């Protein structure tokens, strides 16, 4: 315990810098994942056969070891922050894509037909009916993806991208448990804080009528 306290005292500034790097890399990958996976997931609901193929391909990509992905990217993008973000982006895709597809497909068809009866365009149906009624499922995928990515981002230090993984791998190389814990504890806290914040965001994004209906059902 004394060693850990000493670590935080001696590495306070570096810890803040590495935490910021870790958060930047992780959130950049998740935001890219959202930008690609949510629209793609919505489009795939219009073509279930294509959806099975696309989700299958993304699922296979996620089974590839992260170090293998990094090794594949390095010859094209070199080392540093960008290849780390691209690699993490690949891992961020599946939970968001799958949950968006499942959530939008699960929207009550009567609501969609009612919207069409009111003269809504496809875009209006997506924005006003499908997304609001599937936001909790979509956000569950985003929350899961964010936690995964924050954990996997420790490997970014292997290619010089920085982050809290620097402490962990330095600790492993030097047989310094204090460095290992000094990196692992902030990663865990960061994942919990981001998951909590996204949970609050999900609550805010869920339409009030839907929240009240769920709370009344409980």
Swiss-Prot record:
Any one Pfam family match given in the protein's UniProt record, by short name: BPD_transp_1
Membrane topology: Multi-pass membrane protein
InterPro entries cross-referenced by the UniProt entry: ABC_transp_perm/SBD, MetI-like, MetI-like_sf
SUPFAM superfamilies: MetI-like
Transmembrane segments: 23-43, 48-68, 79-101, 149-169, 179-199
Subcellular localization(s) per the UniProt record: Cell membrane
GO CC terms of this entry: plasma membrane
Record keywords, A-Z: Cell membrane, Membrane, Stress response, Transmembrane, Transmembrane helix, Transport
Factors inducing expression: The complex is induced by either hyperosmotic stress or by low temperature. Osmotic induction is sigma B-dependent.
GO terms classed as biological process: glycine betaine transport; transmembrane transport
Disruption phenotype: Mutants are impaired in both chill-activated and osmotically activated carnitine transport.
Family: Belongs to the binding-protein-dependent transport system permease family.
Function of the molecule: Part of the ABC transporter complex OpuCABCD involved in carnitine uptake. Probably responsible for the translocation of the substrate across the membrane. Involved, with BetL and GbuABC, in osmoprotection and cryoprotection of Listeria. Can also mediate weak glycine betaine transport.
Oligomeric and partner information: The complex is composed of two ATP-binding proteins (OpuCA), two transmembrane proteins (OpuCB and OpuCD) and a solute-binding protein (OpuCC).
Annotated protein name in UniProt: Carnitine transport permease protein OpuCB
Organism from which the protein derives: Listeria monocytogenes serotype 1/2a (strain 10403S)
Lineage: Bacteria, Bacillati, Bacillota, Bacilli, Bacillales
């Amino acid at each position: 315990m004394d060693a850990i306290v000493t670590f935080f005292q001696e590495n306070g500034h570096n810890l803040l810098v590495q935490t910021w790097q870790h958060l930047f890399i992780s959130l950049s990958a998740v935001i890219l994942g959202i930008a690609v996976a949510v629209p793609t997931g919505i489009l795939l609901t219009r073509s279930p056969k294509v959806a099975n193929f696309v989700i299958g391909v993304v699922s296979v990509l996620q089974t590839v070891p992260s170090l293998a992905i990094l090794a594949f990217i390095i010859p094209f993008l070199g080392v540093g922050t960008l290849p780390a973000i691209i690699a993490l982006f690949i891992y961020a895709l599946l939970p968001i894509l799958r949950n968006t597809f499942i959530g939008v497909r699960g929207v009550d068809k009567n609501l969609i037909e009612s919207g069409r009866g009111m003269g809504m365009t496809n875009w209006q149906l997506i924005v006003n009916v499908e997304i609001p009624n599937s936001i909790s499922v979509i956000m569950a995928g985003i929350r899961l993806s964010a936690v995964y990515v924050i954990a996997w981002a420790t490997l970014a230090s292997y290619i010089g991208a920085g982050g809290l993984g620097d402490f962990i791998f330095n600790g492993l190389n030097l047989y310094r448990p204090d460095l290992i814990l000094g990196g692992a504890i902030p990663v865990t806290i960061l994942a919990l804080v981001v998951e909590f914040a996204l949970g609050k965001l999900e609550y805010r994004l869920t339409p009030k009528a839907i929240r009240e209906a769920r709370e009344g059902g409980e």
